[in-house]
Every structure is written in structure tokens, then in C-alpha cells.
């Protein structure tokens, strides 16, 4: 079992990363999450802000840390990765669209949440899917 840790920028990512289904997936892959830290906003993913979070996850036994963020208003994935800064034993995952766009595309989940007939034809075209939800 490989111990990993996560640093994310918001509650949506936190909800997914701490879900039982995600933990079961990690287990199937031979991975164990030692913790998820929500820095509450991508501006808090700057190196001086995440240093202590990385240290805490490593102290808990993580051998690799995954940082999850959205592209947001950045024009380029590379610029987003450079803003966060690459580090040893760290993987930066940049979602091109905000993760909330995935919810807009999941008709079954949205039907359960809103208890009705839900359909959203082009979630990938939403500039700010969180506000749409």
C-alpha cells in the first residue's frame, strides 16, 4: 500500500477526495490517503502557502502528494503549474474546466440533488459552472 496525500483548492474537491467511493478506488489501486487539505482557493496554492501542508502530509507518511486545482482564469496549464511550482514527490493536476462542470454533465446525480428532471446539454461551455449550479 502506497501512502499519498492531497492538497485541493475547494470544498468540491474535498468532498470527492473524502468520499467512500474514492477511498474504495484508492484501495483497489493499492493506495491509501493519509489526508486531504483544503486550502480554500487557488490563490492559496502558492509555494509559501502550501509548504507547511506538504510537510504535514509527509509527516503523516505520504510518499507522494497530489495537488488538485482548476485552470480558472489562467490561459495555460503550464502557467498554472509554474505558479504552484513543481516539487519532488508532488504531482500537480490541473482541470481545464472547473470540477463543477462534471456535475453539470452528470444528469443522474443532478436529478437526485434537485429532485427533478435535470438536463444540461453543454456543461463544457460554461465559464463558471459553480455559479450555474
What positions do the PLM features span?
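A short linear-motif detector with a strong N-terminal bias
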Residues: 43-47, 72-73, 83
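A broadly tuned preference for mixed-charge, low-complexity surface segments
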Residues: 50-69, 112-130
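RecA-like P-loop NTPase motor core
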Residues: 1-60
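Activity-critical C-terminal alpha-helical subdomain
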Residues: 77-133
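Short coil/turn segments at beta-strand junctions that form active-site/ligand-binding loops
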Residues: 2, 61-64, 88-90
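A short acidic (Asp/Glu
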Residues: 15-18, 76-80
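Acidic beta-strand-to-loop metal/phosphate-binding motif
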Residues: 5-9, 62-74
Amino acid at each position: 500500500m502506497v501512502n499519498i496525500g492531497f492538497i485541493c483548492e475547494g470544498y468540491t474537491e474535498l468532498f470527492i477526495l473524502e468520499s467512500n467511493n474514492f477511498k474504495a478506488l484508492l484501495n483497489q489501486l493499492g493506495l491509501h490517503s493519509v489526508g486531504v487539505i483544503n486550502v480554500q482557493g487557488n490563490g492559496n496554492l502558492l509555494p509559501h502557502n502550501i509548504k507547511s501542508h506538504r510537510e504535514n502530509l509527509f509527516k503523516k507518511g505520504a510518499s507522494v502528494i497530489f495537488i488538485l486545482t482548476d485552470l480558472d482564469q489562467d490561459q495555460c496549464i503550464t502557467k498554472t503549474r509554474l505558479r504552484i511550482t513543481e516539487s519532488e514527490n508532488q504531482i500537480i493536476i490541473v482541470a481545464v474546466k472547473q470540477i463543477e462542470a462534471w456535475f453539470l454533465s452528470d444528469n443522474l446525480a443532478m436529478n437526485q440533488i434537485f429532485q427533478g428532471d435535470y438536463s444540461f446539454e453543454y456543461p463544457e461551455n460554461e465559464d463558471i459552472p459553480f455559479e450555474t449550479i
